Structure formats: C-alpha cells, structure tokens
From Swiss-Prot:
Main location: cytoplasm
GO biological process, one term: translation
Keywords: Acetylation, Cytoplasm, Ribonucleoprotein, Ribosomal protein
UniProt name for this protein: Small ribosomal subunit protein eS1
Gene Ontology CC annotation, any one: cytosolic small ribosomal subunit
Keyword Glycoprotein on entry: no
InterPro entries linked: Ribosomal_eS1, Ribosomal_eS1_CS, Ribosomal_eS1_euk
N-acetylalanine: residues bearing it: 2
Length: 256
C-alpha cells in the first residue's frame, strides 16, 4: 500500500489559534461633570479609545453631546419630564467639563398636555444672550376655563392668540438678552419664565401648562477656558501661568 496523504483526514482550520482580544482593553473611562448650576455634577461615564500615536483621546471627546434627565441632575422627581443636553468642551485628566447645550420636554409629557376643549398656543424666538450665545427658544401654553365658567370648552379667539404670542415673544427675548447662558439655565430649572408668562397673560386669557418646550443652541462664541472653569467653580479666569524671566541663569553653573 502506497504511503501518502490521506485526504479524509481533516485539516486544521485557519484562525483557531488566533488570540481573542477584548475590545474594552483598548478603551478607557472618563467622568462627565455638569456645570455648577446643577446640584448633582456627576453625570456619568463615557468610553473612548485610548490615545495611540497621533490619535489623541481628547480630540474624540471634545464636542461630544450627552442627554441627561433633569431629575438626575437636581435630585428631584419634579423635573423628570425635562431633558438637558450637555456638551463636552474641555478634558481635565479623567474629567470631562461640559456646558449647557439644550433643553427639551419628554414626548410623553408633551402628548399628555394636548387635550380637547382647549387651545394650544406656541411661540418661538431666536435671540443672542449677553455672552454671545445664539439660542432658539420654543414655548407652549394651553388655555383654561374662566373662574365660574359652566361651558366645557375654553377656546381662544385669533386675536387672543396673537396677543398672547406677542407677550410670550417679548418676555422670552427680554429674559434671554439680559442673561448669560449660565444665568438663563438657572432661570429655566425652577421655571421662573413660565410663571412670568402666565401672570402677564392672565388679563388676555387664562393659561395653564405654560412650559419652555425646547431650547436649541444655534451658535456659540469662541471657546474661553477661563469662563468654563469659572462655570465649574474649579478656578478663576484670572489664574494663569507665570512667565519665566528672560535673564534666568542656572545657580549651579555660577557657583562652579
């Protein structure tokens, strides 16, 4: 019998001895920090590939936008129907310093407010803040029945709607123009603007469920590290490195 290759014997398959690499071993975790305007500054963690060669991890982290429930940032379930967007502007070690990027209502909250027998009034303005941020602010409001009203419906006339929309636009424009982005954020959290709109329009038509439905950031000024550090309460904007004197000489060389 001739001795040779047995074709029936199974050959070893390629790739069986290849070493399996855990994809998470090439990544590292970073902590996301919210601005000091929020009570809970620890937002969470995010993953990114480790810095290798010319690829720097901070380049992939800057500009990343995260969406967080406002209830988690404030520690209160009263804010559970609002979502806040935070944008990563600076990397400090393993901490990511963020800034306000937008605000929105949850879909279930928005749909639960739309009902029969009432009028929905919407308004939006595009305004620049005191620190050169361009924002588009959307507001919604619903009519409610007059005191001692028997009729079920509380529809507003077109003239009422136009007058209310004008008042809402004026209040939004004034509040945004006279505030920095941090000051505006502190007004949006306790819903100060909502109550002001409701009080200003009660003589035209009584309103209910007045909310800032959405805040969208359209344009931002040139990045200022000092302003961001002040916003996070970690350092003042005036702290800078000291300039080395040009006539410096090594003391050891002079004593030899």
């Amino acid at each position: 019998m001739a001795v040779g290759k047995n074709k029936r014997l199974s050959k070893g398959k390629k790739g069986l001895k290849k070493k399996v690499v855990d994809p998470f071993s090439r990544k590292e975790w970073y902590d996301i920090k919210a601005p000091s305007t929020f009570e809970n500054r620890n937002v969470g963690k995010t993953l990114v590939n480790k810095s290798t060669g010319l690829k720097n991890a901070s380049d992939y982290l800057k500009g990343r936008v995260v969406e967080v429930c406002l209830a988690d940032l404030q520690g209160s379930e009263d804010h559970s129907f609002r979502k806040v967007k935070l944008r990563v502007d600076e990397v400090q070690g393993k901490n990511l310093l963020t800034n306000f990027h937008g605000l929105d209502l949850t879909t279930d909250k928005y749909r639960s407010m739309v009902r029969k027998w009432q009028t929905l009034i919407e308004a939006n303005v595009t305004v620049k803040t005191a620190d050169e941020y361009v924002l588009r602010v959307f507001a919604i409001a619903f009519t409610r029945r007059q005191p001692n009203q028997v009729k079920k419906a509380c529809y507003a006339q077109s003239s009422h709607i136009r007058a209310i929309r004008k008042v809402i636009s004026e209040i939004l424009t004034r509040e945004v123009q006279n505030s920095t982005l941090a000051q505006l954020t502190s007004k949006l959290i306790p819903e100060v603007i909502n109550k002001e709109i409701e009080n200003a329009t009660k003589d035209i038509f009584p309103l209910q469920n007045v909310h800032i439905r959405k805040v969208k950031l359209l344009k931002q000024p040139k990045f200022d590290l000092g302003a961001l550090m002040t916003l996070h309460g970690e350092a003042s904007g005036e702290e800078k490195g000291k300039k080395v004197a040009s006539g410096f000489k090594d003391e050891i060389l002079e004593t030899v």
